[in-house]
Amino acid sequence: MSSAIHNRLALLRAERGLSRKALAEAVGVNFQTIGYLERGDYSASLELALKLAAYFEVPVEALFSLEPFESLFKR
């Protein structure tokens, strides 16, 4: 089993027209942290995962997963 945590952070951020900086300020982290999360270079702490889910008003499992998310686009 892979230890990677997959997320939809970039997708949700783009849907709402948010910059990394704006999202980072809203949840109290450095904007670089958002980039690290989006690229999978860093896994969010439970506290940060909960803050991000609350900000986007989605369940944590809609934002983060142990399994890759299915593509939203059909091939």
Question: Where do the model's predicted regions map?
Answer:
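Alpha-helical residues within the helix-turn-helix
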Residues: 14, 25, 54
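Residue-level signal for the short linker/turn that defines the boundary of a DNA-recognition helix
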Residues: 7, 17-18, 44-47
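DNA major-groove recognition helix of helix-turn-helix/homeodomain DNA-binding modules
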Residues: 47-62
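Short, conserved catalytic or interaction motifs in soluble domains
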Residues: 39, 58, 68
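Short alpha-helical DNA-recognition segment
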Residues: 17-36
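A short, Lys/Arg-rich alpha-helix, primarily the initiator
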Residues: 1-15
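Short, charged recognition helix plus adjacent turn
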Residues: 54, 64-75
